[in-house]
Design a protein with these regions (language model features):
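Membrane-anchoring alpha-helices and their flanking helix-loop junctions
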Residues: 1-126, 144-206
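Histidine-centered phosphotransfer motif of kinases
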Residues: 131-139
Length: 206
C-alpha cells in the first residue's frame, strides 16, 4: 500500500516547481527577459550553485521514498502509524495550501515576478498577499519545505530543509537591501509595517 501523505507531498512539490517553470516561461514570453533564471548578481550566482542541486533533491527525494528506496531514504517505520502518521497527513494538507497560496502570489506579481535581484525596474507590490508580509512566496516555500521534511523525516530531507530555510533568509535580506536602494522611503515605510515571513504584530517606528 502506498504512503498517501508521501505521495501527496511528492506531487505537490513537483507542481510547485512546475509552476516556477511556468512563471519563467510567462515572463520570458511577455517581456523577452529570462526572469532571473541566470542571476545578475555574483552573490546570487554563488547561491544558485547550492540551490539548483538542493531543488533537484527536494523534488527527487519524496519520489525516491515512494519507490521502495534504501532504508536511509525511506519513511522511517515509526512515522508510518498512529499519531506520527496523522501529523504527516496534516503536513501534506498544509503543503497543498502552500502551493495554492503561492499560486495566488504568482498571479498578483504577474510580469514583475523574478527569481533574482534585477536591475530591471519593477513595481513595489504592497497589496494582496504582500500587504502584511514582504516575502509571502519565500514564506510559503519555507513552510512547504518544512511540510516535506515532516512527511519524509529522513536525514537527507531534514538537512536539505535546514539549508533551504537558511538560503531563504539570505536571499530575502539581499532582496530587501536592493529594494530599499531602488524604492527608498516608500520601501522603508512598507518594511516598517510588515514582517519578512510572518505578519508583524507591531509597527516599527521611524
Amino acid at each position: 500500500m502506498s504512503d498517501l501523505p508521501l505521495l501527496v507531498v511528492a506531487i505537490t512539490v513537483s507542481l510547485y516547481w512546475t509552476g516556477v517553470g511556468a512563471m519563467i516561461v510567462r515572463v520570458r514570453r511577455h517581456l523577452r527577459k529570462d526572469a532571473g533564471l541566470v542571476p545578475e548578481q555574483a552573490r546570487e550566482r554563488m547561491m544558485w550553485l547550492v540551490w539548483v542541486p538542493l531543488v533537484a533533491s527536494w523534488i527527487a527525494l519524496p519520489w525516491l521514498a515512494t519507490s521502495h528506496a534504501e532504508p536511509w531514504l525511506a519513511v522511517p517505520p515509526w512515522a508510518r502509524d498512529g499519531l506520527p502518521f496523522a501529523v504527516r497527513v496534516a503536513a501534506a494538507l498544509v503543503g497543498i495550501a502552500c502551493l495554492l497560496a503561492t499560486a495566488r502570489c504568482w498571479k498578483r506579481m504577474g510580469d514583475d515576478w523574478r527569481m533574482d535581484v534585477s536591475s530591471r525596474s519593477t513595481a513595489l507590490i504592497t497589496d494582496g498577499p504582500f500587504r502584511r508580509i514582504r516575502h509571502p512566496i519565500y514564506a510559503f516555500s519555507i513552510l512547504l519545505m518544512i511540510c516535506t521534511a515532516v512527511v519524509l523525516p529522513t536525514p537527507p530531507m531534514i538537512a536539505i530543509a535546514v539549508l533551504h530555510v537558511t538560503l531563504m533568509h539570505v536571499k530575502a535580506r539581499n532582496e530587501e537591501a536592493h529594494l530599499a536602494s531602488v524604492h527608498g522611503a516608500e520601501y522603508a515605510q512598507y518594511a516598517a509595517r510588515t514582517g519578512r515571513f510572518v505578519p508583524r504584530l507591531t509597527t516599527r517606528g521611524p
